[in-house]
Each structure stands twice: as C-alpha cells, then as structure tokens.
Amino acid sequence: MKLSGILLIFVCCWSGTSRAANVNIATLTCVKYQNEVIAAPNPAPGSDPINTMMWLFGYSVAKSGAHVMYGDALASFGFALDAECKDNPAESLLEALSAVKPNTKNPMDLTELECQTFAARHLDLVKSDLESANTIMMWLYGFAVAKAGGHLFDADAVGTFESALMGDCQKNPGRSLFDELTGVKWGKSKSP
C-alpha cells in the first residue's frame, strides 16, 4: 500500500513538471504568466526565470522583424513586459510581447556574425561561464522559435536546439548566424 501511495505521488509530481516545461504563449494570459511561470510558488526543477525572460526577449525581437541582439536591453525589456502585463492582465503573453519594444542600444547584427565565429565564441563561453552561455543560447532559441512561426516555450528542448544549431554552424561555417537561426530544425518544439 505504501509503495502504491509513493508511486501515485511520484506520478502526480512528474506530470506536473512536464506541464510546467511547456508554455503556450498564445493562450497563456499575462496574469497566469506572472503568477504561475515567473513567480511560481513551486517552480519546476531546473526552471530559471532569467532564462525564461531571455527566451521571451529573443522571441519578441524576432517577432518585431529585427535581426539584432541587444546586449544592454534585458532589464528594460523585463520591466516593460512586467508593466504591460500588470496593465493588461487578461492579455495573452503573445500579445504583450508584441507591445513591448526593447531598448535598441548596442545592437549586434546577427546577419553580420558568421556561424563559425559564433560557434567558437560560444564554446569558449561554455568553458569559462556556462551559465552565461546557456542564457545566450536561450535567447537564440526564443528567436528561432519565433522565426519558425511557433509559440511554444519548452525549456527542456534548449539542449536539442543547441546541438542542432551548433551542428548547422559546423556544416555551414560561413553562413550568418541569422540565416542559421531561421533555418535550424530541432524537433517538435519548433512549431505549435
């Protein structure tokens, strides 16, 4: 009897964490995003609010039509998204992302960055500062999902995305990072 009770608790916890990993930003309201994703009382194992915000930031930049990474804009983007969601709690997160405009200081044009240069820098950063490398990869992942027309955030798929992107950069070292991001294939999370 004890074993079946433990098994039941494990199954409930397991199903809860798998649901937490996938977020449909087209149907998620701002109020749910703020209460259940960013400030979740019981966050899913491995969840990281900064990486979630980076994914949303990359997604927002791609949806705006821009092809740049703004190195100094994460904080202002986060505050602007927070304000948009507080002012419009019933709005979908996808709509809120469309309304938020990032600070455009210090842009890095992804069309001018060769894939081989990015890959070398990324591998160096992985060795020296894994957390920062993962955070940047999360931004690129959000950007690629938006470019593919998707609207699902699956934090568990960032590793698959990273492997696919790095593999594509190895095959096409002279292509721009932007071109690779718009064509990378990494599995079911790419589209809705």
Where do the protein language model's features map onto the residues?
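Bacterial N-terminal signal peptides
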Residues: 6-14
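Compact alpha-helical subdomains of small soluble proteins
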Residues: 23, 39-112, 118-192
